[in-house]
Amino acid sequence: MADKTVKELADMVSKTASAVQQQLVDAGLPARAEGDLVTELEQEKLVTYLKQSHGQEEKRRISLKSKTTSTARVTGSSGKSKSVNVEVRKKKVFEKPDPEKMAEELAAREQAMIESQARAAKDAEDRAATKKKSEERQAATLAAMRASLGSSKKSDDKNDDISTSVVVKKGGKTTIEVKPKDQPKKKVTATKPKVETAVERKAREVREKEEARLREIETETRRTQAEEAQKRTLEQMRKMAGQYTDQPATEVRKDEPLAEGLVGDALEESFEKERREIKRGTSTTSARGRGRRKNQDEREIKNRKNGLRSSQSSQHKFEKPVEKIVYDVEISEQITVSDLAQRMAVKAREVTKLLMKMGEIARESDMIDQATASLIVEEMGHNPVPVSDTKVEDDLQDAVDERSSNVQTRPPVVTIMGHVDHGKTSLLDKIRETKVATGEAGGITQHIGAYHVKTARGVITFLDTPGHAAFSAMRSRGAQATDIVVLVVAADDGMMPQTEEAIDHARAAGTPLIVAINKMDKPSADPDRVLNELTAKEVVSEDWGGDTPMARISAKTGDGIDELLELISLQAELMELEAPLDGPAQGVVIESRLEKGRGPVVSVLVKKGTLKQGDLVLAGEYYGKVRAMTDEHGKRIQSAGPSIPVEILGLPETPAAGSEFLVLTDEKKAREVADFRTNRERERQLERQNAMRLESMFDQMEQGNVSYLNIVLKTDVRGSLEALLAALNELSTDEVKVRVISSGVGPISESDVTLAESSEAVLLGFNVRADATARRKSDSANMDIRYYSVIYGLIDDVKAAMSGMLAPEHREKILGVADVREVFRSSKFGAAAGCMVVEGTIYRNKPIRVLRNDQVIFTGQLQSLRRYKEDVNEVRTGMECGLAVRGYDVEAGDKIEVFEIQEFARTI
């Protein structure tokens, strides 16, 4: 852009010259005539003003884009290479700095430089003042010394007529002047006399004393200067180190001396530098030394900022111990080889080698007994410490503080047991309707399986147990956790297998039994038959002279329910049930499940103490604080006393149903016990695996003949899961085995569908449903998810699937028998036999056997079957025929037996 006149600018922008002149004035430029020149800088200023006036800012950022294209050779999975176009795009942005910001930054830098120079000048003045004070103190000390020396010389002159003076010159040289009385002055040095007179000896002694005093003063002065330098350096290094105290650098040990830390490194270097300067008598160093020391200091400061320590002070050097370390190795009753090696701080293969020398072959994961482990520990030079598996549990019981000072009567816990479909749940529903308030009637959930009701004689807690055969373990736990067992027997059905099992569980637990004969409203009810069957099981009614209370009830009409509750209350009074109200709570886990949005939900029954919200609960292998508590109606509560069922939230996982829970105050103790129980369960699983190793070897040998039905099982509660797992394991046969790949509590998730798809398993849900993500995943994978609410249907479907996997059964059926009467030769078939069909029918295309003297000598097929020179497909009993056996020559008197192989489907 060259210089132009105002007229030329007006022509370029198609405006009048007066308008351009006015714009120049508005832009802050001096007024110009039409013929005056406008420089390039003024033109740029005018353009900038016009852009700003029209709302456009100066473009300060410029973006440059570049694109390069190249070709690369890529080798594919098949080994062939192909060309691929590679395009690389780059973008660079250049931003023009803002003049105002640049001016501000420049002013800030100038201000900082001025302040830095002022601080440097002040520091120089302080150092000069300090140096001046030090020199003044030194001069005063030397003046005092000269004064004392002068007085001593005057006294010596009076005695010896000799004047001696000591002159200290700069640089450290000492000259002694000896002046005899009334003689001209003569300078004599202490090192040049040839003949030492008495006067000279006296002067030498005085000189030596003064030199010693001067050396002491000089040493004291240097020490004072060194201390001051150390103090200054220490203060500077502390200020520097304070900038990095917030960084998580290498932690300095408490027993580490100061010289090994951050400040110590700097102190050592600074002190050494001060010593060298004092020794040389100067405080300056060479330029090369200053540069090298500066670079080293910068590196050290950079390392400290990055959280690093000096290699000389922080690098750990391993020193091999001189003496062997002897450990006290705790050995439980069963321990794995790897755990034993870890406790002795050796590798597992050393333990396995020692076991091989002892004649035992074991892997790292194998279990060994306590005696063998003790021998290994002693052989390796350590001290074995046998530990009982129950020690931790015993210590836990000792740690539980049972304050039984406030003992009160507690409600009885009653378990309803009996055969399936005998009316247990109907009885509980009827009791709920008649004894629970109207507002609470619908608040009982099906899964908790426990609730308490108020009667005229007090509170009664009921537990419900399933009656199916698969739930034997749950019924056993119910009998153990209860005070009274109510056995429900249908009057029209009598004794059943689960009824007898419930009687056995009650006797094994030593629990009193009350019999409730249900369904008395049915016309087919026969209570006398029920009494006879119970008497056969040694359960004799009080009416018949026994000790077992019995009540005849109808869960449908409600008849006899009050009488049953009366019997329960009387039995509870006779038992005198008591429990401490205060102290840590103890009880049993009734059921546990996993709910979406709430996490693990555990139903517990308190047996002792009071359970409060916020208590630390240990249940089985898990522990946690109670975050929330609800009763059987779903209402939030803060505490629960003895014999009260509640649901708690706060445990990390669902504990096993039937496991005991207790409240602890020490979280460390709870963690220790939980870890111990987890390890014990793992050891038990390893024991079971070792016990089944031989069986698994045989299974592997026969693996070609064994089929597996893989199942992924999800249930609503933990008790149902345990019952179904036991029932499915019992279905396994020698040919088809049920293998549960995964099982758990809670809804079916996407991970369950993925696992079932990868393992080709059947996905089963018992009282649970799949979430939306799992349904979409199953639909895309074309996988069927089966839902069940009754255990019968699930077991029957699994049986049907196993039956379909069974190999069909092959049976042989004899269709007909023919006697060979004569053998003749044929040019076409060779040896042909004339036969008489004596039994059944002979078929042409069926397999045959040739019997000679009732022994099978050949098995094959017929080549030809004729009757009167005509080919036929079959010949019936009593008819003659001619036949030829393919690949074998028959003789007269042989028998031809025709048979077929039939397949029959097998079922479990």
Swiss-Prot record:
Any one Pfam family match given in the protein's UniProt record, by short name = GTP_EFTU
Q: List the disulfide bonds.
A: none
Q: Can you tell me which family this protein belongs to?
A: Belongs to the TRAFAC class translation factor GTPase superfamily. Classic translation factor GTPase family. IF-2 subfamily.
Q: Detail which positions bind GTP.
A: 418-425, 464-468, 518-521
Residues covered by region (G5): 554-556
User: Do you know which HAMAP family this protein is assigned to?
Assistant: IF_2_B (MF_00100_B)
Which is a Gene Ontology cellular component entry for this protein?
cytosol
Q: Looking at the record, which segments are called G1?
A: 418-425
Please note every region of biased composition (Basic and acidic residues): 94-108, 120-138, 176-185, 193-238, 270-280, 294-303
What is this protein's record name? Answer: Translation initiation factor IF-2
